[in-house]
Amino acid sequence: MKVALVGCGAVTQAVYVPLLSRRRELFEVAAVCDLSATLAGAVGDRLGVARRHTDLGEMLAEGGFDAVLMLASGSHGEPVRQALAAGYAVLCEKPLALTEAEVAALPEGRLMVGYMKQYDPAVRRAEEMLAELGGAAVIRSVEVTVLHPSAEAQLGFANLSQARDVDVAPLRAAENAVLDRALGAEAGPEVRSVYSVALGSICHDLSLLRRFTGSPVKVDHVETWGGLPGSIEISGPLPVAGRYSIRWHYLEDYPAYRETVVVHHASGSLELVFPAPYLMNAPTVLTAVSGAETRAEYREVTEAFETQLLAFHAFVTSGKPPLTDAAGALEDIVTAQRIAARYAVQHDLALGGEAGDR
C-alpha cells in the first residue's frame, strides 16, 4: 500500500520512520510533506523518498498513493478534510480536531484516528479480562496518574532533525483562532492550557475510558496547580457504574514518563503501567490482582504503534473497522470541552465558543 506522510516532526522521525522502514512488505512511502523543507528533506532521505512537498494541496493533487498518514501537530481538521475530499484513506494522529465544527465539516470517507494505546496488547488483554468479569457494570473506579517529563527529556535519544526554516507565528495565530471557536476569544491562558492538555495528552486516557466503560458524560471537578501546564486533576461519574479520576502532572525534570491506569472492580484490580511512548517495543505491564491476593503479570513487546499501523492497513485493504473513527474522536473533543467548562465555572473564568454550551 502506497502512503504519503504529512508532518515530519518528532513523532514521525522517532516512531513512524523506523516502523515504516521495517514493514516495507506492507507500506511504500511515496511522498512526504511538511511546511519545513528541511524536515521533509530529512525524512525523505531516511526513507529514500524522492517526492518532497511543502504544500499539502499540491501533494494531494499530484497523487500516486493510496492513503495519507496525518502526523503533524495541532488540529488536523482542515488537512484531513482536504485528504478525504481528494478520495484518500486517512490515518490521523490524535487529536482529530480542536472543535466539533471541524469534525462536522469532514466529508464521508475512510478515516481512522490514531490512539495507539488502544492497540497496546496489554490494553486489549485488560479489555478481555474486564469483559469476562462482567464489563463496565462491575467497575468501582478507574484511576489514572500521568507523570509527564518535558518532550526534550523523552526524545533526547532520538537525534531529531529540527525545523528552523518556518515562521511559527502564523501557525500559532491559526491555532489560536481555532481555540477561540472552541473556548471563546475571551478564554484566558488557564482555560486554554487545560483544554490543550486534555486534547493533547489526557485524550489517551479518555480513549481508554471509551474502551473500558464508554466516554464520561459528566465532569464533576477540575483543579490545577503548580503553574502552567502544571498539574491537572479531573473526576466524575462513569456512564454505567463507578467513578473516574485523572491526575496529570507535568514534571519537566522527572526521570522518565510514566502512566498508570488502574481499574478497581468488586473482586480485584487491573493495573496498566505504560512506559514512555517513544521507546519502541518497551512493554506495557498489566497486573491483575484477584482472590487470595493473587497477582498475575502480563507483558508483551509487540509495539502498539506498529499494531495500529497494521490495523490501518487492514482498514484500507479489507475494510476492517478501526477502534476509533470520527465519532469516537468527537467524543473526546466533547469531553475535553466539558473539562474546560467545569474548570471555568469552578474558578469563575471567562468561557464561550463550543465549550460554553457544555
Language model: regions and residue ranges:
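N-terminal Rossmann-like dinucleotide-binding module
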Residues: 1-47
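Short active-site oxyanion
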Residues: 27-31, 66-68, 196
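Beta-loop-alpha module in the N-terminal Rossmann-like domain of NAD(P)-dependent dehydrogenases
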Residues: 49-106
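C-terminal helix-rich "cap/oligomerization" subdomain common to oxidoreductases
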Residues: 67-69, 109-110, 226-228, 311-358
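A contiguous active-site-proximal alpha/beta segment in oxidoreductase catalytic domains
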Residues: 97-168
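Oxidoreductase and adenylate-handling cofactor-binding alpha/beta cores
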Residues: 119-143, 156-157, 182-186, 191-192, ...
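Charged, glycine/proline-rich intrinsically disordered loops and linkers
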Residues: 152-191
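Contiguous beta-strand/loop segments that form the cofactor/metal-binding neighborhood of enzyme cores
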Residues: 189-278, 299, 306-320, 337, ...
